[in-house]
Amino acid sequence: MTSPLTPADQLIIALDGMERAEALAFISKLPEVSWVKVGLELFVSAGPEVLADLREQGLQIFLDLKFHDIPATIAGACRRAASFGAELITVHACAGRAALAEAQAAACEGAAEVGLSAPRLLAVTVLTSWDQKRLANELCIPQSLQARVEWLAELAAESGLGGCVCSPWEVSGLRRLHPSPFELVTPGIRPSGAELADQVRVMSPAAALNAGASRLVIGRPITRAVDPAEAFARCCLEIEQRQLD
């Protein structure tokens, strides 16, 4: 039987807006953190070497590059990304069934070639900065946002992926359709009192987990806090209290 995840295992700290040295210095002050997210900005500025640096600190990596291209290109990118040791890697669900299936197979091959465990690929559904009105007006998508996310998550599951990325607003409906171990990783997490910034579909850590989220991605409320360690501890406490209720 799988042991329940600890609060630290359920929180992924997004190292967005940081250079390599800043990211490494920041995370070294948070020894309780287990997971970090490396996104496009940090990866483009620092390269794959930053992943090795973070792994040396014992951290697990959510490599959030949101690959979206033709199947062969996505597969090649996922093969290389898996060889860097990331545990979670994102691809856009809109890339389609062939691209998702080939990406999953390539990631397994890339990890095996360097003696690593296969990563879990996550399909990005609809970004948390989008709302229903923009989806219709800018992309001409007539589906409701919930229906769109559920359709893309089903595509990911049918393609053999291990989970998807969605806002916390869609988690409850998705969890009914896709029981664990299908992972639902949710950005748009805002503890009580935190600013929304450019996120639209947001929720508190406890509420998102109660809805069925597997892991939570949280950035600015911790990385820009006056005391990041204390902010992280507060999030963990909120999760612990939820587990006791």
Curated annotation (Swiss-Prot):
Q: What keywords were assigned to this record?
A: Decarboxylase, Lyase, Pyrimidine biosynthesis
Which molecular function terms from Gene Ontology are attached? Answer: orotidine-5'-phosphate decarboxylase activity
Q: How does it assemble?
A: Homodimer.
Q: Superkingdom of this entry's organism?
A: Bacteria
Role summary: Catalyzes the decarboxylation of orotidine 5'-monophosphate (OMP) to uridine 5'-monophosphate (UMP).
Reactions catalysed, as given in the entry: orotidine 5'-phosphate + H(+) = UMP + CO2
UniProt GO cellular component terms: cytosol
Protein name per the record: Orotidine 5'-phosphate decarboxylase
What is an annotated GO biological process for this record, any one?
A: 'de novo' UMP biosynthetic process
The record's annotation in Gene3D superfamilies points to: Aldolase class I
Give the record's pathway: Pyrimidine metabolism; UMP biosynthesis via de novo pathway; UMP from orotate: step 2/2
Annotated residues for binding of substrate: 16, 37, 64-73, 128, 190, 199, 219-220
Q: Which PANTHER family match?
A: OROTIDINE 5'-PHOSPHATE DECARBOXYLASE
What are the annotated disulfide bridges?
A: none
Q: Which organism is it from?
A: Prochlorococcus marinus (strain MIT 9313)
Q: What is its EC number?
A: 4.1.1.23
The family classification in the record reads:
Belongs to the OMP decarboxylase family. Type 1 subfamily.
The organism that produces this protein has a lineage beginning with:
Bacteria, Bacillati, Cyanobacteriota, Cyanophyceae, Synechococcales
* Active site feature: 66
Entry-linked InterPro entries: Aldolase_TIM (IPR013785), OMPdecase (IPR014732), OMPdecase_AS (IPR018089), OMPdecase_bac (IPR047596), OMPdeCOase_dom (IPR001754), RibuloseP-bd_barrel (IPR011060)
